[in-house]
Amino acid sequence: MLSKVRIALDAMGGDVGPAVVIPGAAISLQRHSATEFLLVGDRARIEPELEKHPALKAASRIVHTDVAVSGSDKPSQALRRGRRTSSMWLAIDAVKKGEADVAVSAGNTGALMAMSRFHLRTLPGIDRPAITGIWPTKRGESVVLDLGATIGGDAHHLVSLAVMGAAMASVLFNKPRPTVGLLNIGAEEIKGHEEIREASEILRARNLPELDYIGFVEGDGIGKGLADVIVAEGFSGNIALKAAEGTARQMAELLRNEMQRSWLSKLGYLFARSAFQALRDKMDPNKSNGGVFLGLNGLVVKSHGGTSAEGFAYAIDVGYEMAHYDLLNKINQMLNREGGALNSVQAAQEAVS
C-alpha cells in the first residue's frame, strides 16, 4: 500500500483541457490529501487555472509541452506525431520512468491505448489489454471488462480478462475470491459462440483460487449485480456500456419531464425529493467515470472526454485507489501464483481442446 500516490495528468486531454482537469484535480485532492500531481501540458493554460487552487498548486509540478493529441487523430497518427512530445505521451512516460504511479487522461481513447501499449508494454501472459470500468448495480458495484479495447478474442484472452478483473475487484471490494461471470446471450451452457463456451469450460476445469466462476450472465444480470466481475470481449462490452449510459440519461430525462408535467406531479416530487436525489446520484455517469487499462506494465486511467470537473475527479479517484492499493503488483501476484495462473489456464485450454 502506497502512503503517497503520484499522479500524472494529461492536462490537455478531453474536450476542454485544463479548465476541467485542474479543478477536477483540486476536487480529488480534497478527498485524497496524500497525492502529488504532475500536470503535463501548456504552462500558459495550466497556470491561470492552478492559481485558483492554492492547495493543488502546492501539491503539483508542471511539465510543459504545447503538443496535444486531438480527438480526431487516429492511433497511428498520434503515435507518429505525438510520440515523445505530446502531453498524453509524457504523462504515460512519467509512469514508465517511475516518476508517477498512474497516468490519467481524458484524451482520444484509441491514441491513449496505442501509446500506453507501445510504451508500457503488456504484462507477461497478457496478449492484449482491456478497458475496465466500475458499474453501479442493485448490489453495489461490479467490475466490467473489456469495454472496447479489443474486438474479439479467443478463450485464453477471455480467461486472462477474468483473472485481471478478479484482481481489480479484490482490491476495490476487499474480497479474496470475487465472483466472475461471462457475459453471454443466455445462461445455458450451450449458448454463445465457441470461444466463450471454451472459456467457460476452462474456468470451471481450472477452478482458480483467485476467483469464483459462476457461469454465464445475460445483459440484464450486470445491473442486477449477479457477479463482482463481468467479462466480455470488447465489442459486446462497449455496446453494453453505451446502452447502459444512454438508458440512464433517458430515464433521468423522462423523470424530469414527468415531474414537471402537472402541479400534482410537482407536489409529489417535493415529498419524494430525497428518494429522487438518491436515484439520480446512483445513475450519475460521472460517478462511474474512469476506465482502467488493465494488462499493461503500468497504470493508466481513461476519463470520458466530455466530462465535468466533478466527473474528472472521479477518474482521478479511480487512479488513486488503484495505485494506493498496488493493483499492478496484485495482478502480477495472481498471474504468477502457483507457477502462473495463465500458464495453468493455457494447459487447461489444451486439455479442453
UniProtKB/Swiss-Prot annotation:
Keywords: Cytoplasm, Lipid biosynthesis, Lipid metabolism, Phospholipid biosynthesis, Phospholipid metabolism, Transferase. InterPro entries: FA_synthesis (IPR003664), Phospholipid_synth_PlsX-like (IPR012281). Pathway: Lipid metabolism; phospholipid metabolism. It catalyses: a fatty acyl-[ACP] + phosphate = an acyl phosphate + holo-[ACP]. One of its GO terms (molecular function) is phosphate:acyl-[acyl carrier protein] acyltransferase activity. GO terms for biological process: fatty acid biosynthetic process; phospholipid biosynthetic process. Its EC number is 2.3.1.274. SUPFAM superfamilies: Isocitrate/Isopropylmalate dehydrogenase-like. It comes from the Bacteria. GO terms for cellular component: cytoplasm. It is found in: Cytoplasm. Gene3D superfamilies: Isopropylmalate Dehydrogenase. Pfam families: FA_synthesis (PF02504). Disulfide bonds: none annotated. Homodimer. Probably interacts with PlsY. Catalyzes the reversible formation of acyl-phosphate (acyl-PO(4)) from acyl-[acyl-carrier-protein] (acyl-ACP). This enzyme utilizes acyl-ACP as fatty acyl donor, but not acyl-CoA. Belongs to the PlsX family. This is Phosphate acyltransferase. It comes from Bradyrhizobium diazoefficiens (strain JCM 10833 / BCRC 13528 / IAM 13628 / NBRC 14792 / USDA 110).
